[in-house]
From Swiss-Prot:
<feature type="binding site">
    <location>
        <position position="200"/>
    </location>
    <ligand>
        <name>[2Fe-2S] cluster</name>
    </ligand>
</feature>
<dbReference type="Pfam" id="PF06968">
    <property type="entry name" value="BATS"/>
</dbReference>
<dbReference type="InterPro" id="IPR002684">
    <property type="entry name" value="Biotin_synth/BioAB"/>
</dbReference>
<keyword id="KW-0001">2Fe-2S</keyword>
<dbReference type="InterPro" id="IPR006638">
    <property type="entry name" value="Elp3/MiaA/NifB-like_rSAM"/>
</dbReference>
<feature type="binding site">
    <location>
        <position position="108"/>
    </location>
    <ligand>
        <name>[2Fe-2S] cluster</name>
    </ligand>
</feature>
<dbReference type="GO" id="GO:0009102">
    <property type="term" value="P:biotin biosynthetic process"/>
</dbReference>
<dbReference type="GO" id="GO:0004076">
    <property type="term" value="F:biotin synthase activity"/>
</dbReference>
<comment type="pathway">
    <text>Cofactor biosynthesis; biotin biosynthesis; biotin from 7,8-diaminononanoate: step 2/2.</text>
</comment>
<keyword id="KW-0479">Metal-binding</keyword>
<dbReference type="InterPro" id="IPR007197">
    <property type="entry name" value="rSAM"/>
</dbReference>
<keyword id="KW-0004">4Fe-4S</keyword>
<keyword id="KW-0949">S-adenosyl-L-methionine</keyword>
<feature type="domain" description="Radical SAM core">
    <location>
        <begin position="46"/>
        <end position="275"/>
    </location>
</feature>
<feature type="binding site">
    <location>
        <position position="68"/>
    </location>
    <ligand>
        <name>[4Fe-4S] cluster</name>
    </ligand>
</feature>
<feature type="binding site">
    <location>
        <position position="140"/>
    </location>
    <ligand>
        <name>[2Fe-2S] cluster</name>
    </ligand>
</feature>
<comment type="similarity">
    <text>Belongs to the radical SAM superfamily. Biotin synthase family.</text>
</comment>
Amino acid sequence: MNWIQLAQEVIEGKRISENEALAILNSPDDELLLLLQGAFTIRQTYYGKKVKLNMIMNAKSGFCPENCGYCSQSSISKAPIDAYPMVNKETILEGAKRAHELNVGTYCIVASGRGPTNRDIDHVTEAVREIKDTYGLKICACLGILKPEQAEQLKAAGVDRYNHNVNTSARHHDQITTSHTYEDRVNTVEVVKHSGISPCSGVIVGMKETKEDVVDMAFQLRELDADSIPVNFLHAIDGTPLQGVHELTPIYCLKVLSLFRYVCPTKEIRISGGREVNLKSLQPLGLYAANSIFIGDYLTTAGQEETADHQILKDLGFEVESVEEMKASLQGQ
């Protein structure tokens, strides 16, 4: 397939088919640079050489009643993690200060559990208002399954974006968790959209799914019209049901990122958890398809040093998108 021609057709408005998407994942490895060139042509059309930086605050860790097979915080995990209840407001504000110092545009407040209590919502919204007043950061919340009235409260407090991943395909979902349904996840994204908050929803690749499942994930997110799509690559943690699963190669991960760029050309594609251990030395190439990364640590696993990420961007000739630019792009969605 002519990847450069396909990319140009995407820029002109073509929505690629499932067969074309599957061809991306099945493409010969020696076509990788051509595939990435096409993905970069699309990425550059909509985002230039700007990169959005995101940072996570793990505001509540562990104690989750759900049985997600990939997660070290789940009820079935035996992984030794640092579990704690919701942190105080001062800790959340300290994280925001650190994000501001590192020129991060989006600060992500994440809490474990099936969904937030009303008390959790009150606590988070109080912190969000202070962060907005003090640092002006864009705020993404990730608190679990959300009720409409909770979404409205978050919106009123100034939350810009809400993350709730579909994680995998509808077909593969019950192989990963049975404590909630795929529809529960999709419904939360719809609740977020209805409230006026920008929806963020993504995937975890490498959980024994098929290539067809990965294509289904991308098309589901295209249908959901998620503004931001975090693409995680499984970091198999000892003590979880998926421990020891290492199916991914750096080249396949790059094909996955390219797939999401071709299927969702105008969306923020973020290289998320597991990028260091799965992309390895090919991490920089991922940004030819994606336009966003997390810096710093993840929820229960360590990321690489922030200085290393900034060096990657400098070496690529890319620029960090400023907070002001991120606000402007959000208002345009």
